[in-house]
Amino acid sequence: MEANRSRLLAAARPYIQIYSIFGLTPPIQFFTRTLHKRRRGIVILGYACYLISISLMVIYECYANIVALQKDIHKFHAEDSSKVMGNTQKVLVVAMFVWNQLNILLNFRRLARIYDDIADLEIDLNNASSGFVGQRHWWRFRFRLALSVGLWIVLLVGLTPRFTLVALGPYLHWTNKVLTEIILIMLQLKCTEYCVFVLLIYELILRGRHILQQISVELEGNQSRDSVQELCVALKRNQLLAGRIWGLVNEVSLYFTLSLTLLFLYNELTILQIVNWALIKSVNPNECCQYRRVGTCLLLSINIFLSCLYSEFCIQTYNSISRVLHQMYCLSAAEDYLILKMGLREYSLQMEHLKLIFTCGGLFDINLKFFGGMVVTLFGYIIILVQFKIQFFAQSNFMQNINSTELKAYTA
């Protein structure tokens, strides 16, 4: 993969470099053909050692956070679901980072194919649109990427410490708090990495649809036999490109399957844990973290929402290709030329068969419907948790009243 032969990958390169610094994805230089073989091996070995050191740091910090959690639980006498959820939360963090390193190792070739497919598709789409007017400009994608992902990364990095630093509690050393904040940011950046690839696919779909719309315009204005034959060739080429984009979506979904599954599970469990501790500490009149907890819940929810929203954009744009084909099918040229009519029918059948789905290994689809279902499920668990806590507090107060009554009777 040569990043300089793809303007889309060149626009996404700064974001990929950020993710590689945090150990989330290999540096894009690993996939270039200009790097000397021996030097490339040394760089890969050095980066592997860097990833191992990150994993060791994550394991140590999770251990330190578990120790601090036990002290918090003992202080507030909350040895119920809080301990289970807290320990599960920390184990999920370790699992995500360990799997991320394994994913880099096991799916290195798949990621290389994804980069190659993106670059090849961009070149082929540019070649296919060379005979038409009104081509899309690459700088629009750079602006969309900065607005959709770059701005959110800035907000994540800036707001995560502000919302979560105080909530880490008094039992962690300041160095542990700083490293924990870095780990929390790294976790959420994995979702933005997925968003970058989704937006790359979205741009490819937009270009493919734009070419199809130009073919439709040409069919309306020019219906000579030679022109229609040339447009049928362009239509077939566009059909093949749409099929390749569908295959690219499957590759990206497979690459992010377990990473996103663990991240979504972690975010949902973290929101439940935040609500749990908000209920536990609600009896404290000096509690100052309630609004920050709301901010943390919003950050985690918006991070999932954006990945679902951008995936939904891709799906809706891909599905709009069928509407363009239907409009072309209604043109008089489709009635006059059988080859065009058969080409449109074949393309339409392909679109019906190759449905665009962003999925996590078949466990769930990443779209707005999934996000809505996740929110409803999360609210259901929160209601159950609140009911459980109210019952627990009522029993605790009742037992305290009985003990105080017995103590007064005994002293009397």
Swiss-Prot record:
Residues 29-40, 170-181, 266-294, 391-412 are extracellular. It is found in: Cell membrane. It is a multi-pass membrane protein. The keyword Transmembrane applies. Its main location: membrane. GO terms for biological process: monoatomic ion transmembrane transport; sensory perception of taste; signal transduction. Glycans are attached at N403. One of its GO terms (cellular component) is axon. GO terms for molecular function: ligand-gated monoatomic ion channel activity. Residues 1-7, 62-148, 203-244, 316-369 are cytoplasmic. The chain crosses the membrane at residues 8-28, 41-61, 149-169, 182-202, 245-265, 295-315, 370-390. Keywords: Cell membrane, Glycoprotein, Membrane, Receptor, Transducer, Transmembrane, Transmembrane helix. Belongs to the insect chemoreceptor superfamily. Gustatory receptor (GR) family. Gr2a subfamily. Probable gustatory receptor which mediates acceptance or avoidance behavior, depending on its substrates. This is Putative gustatory receptor 98d.
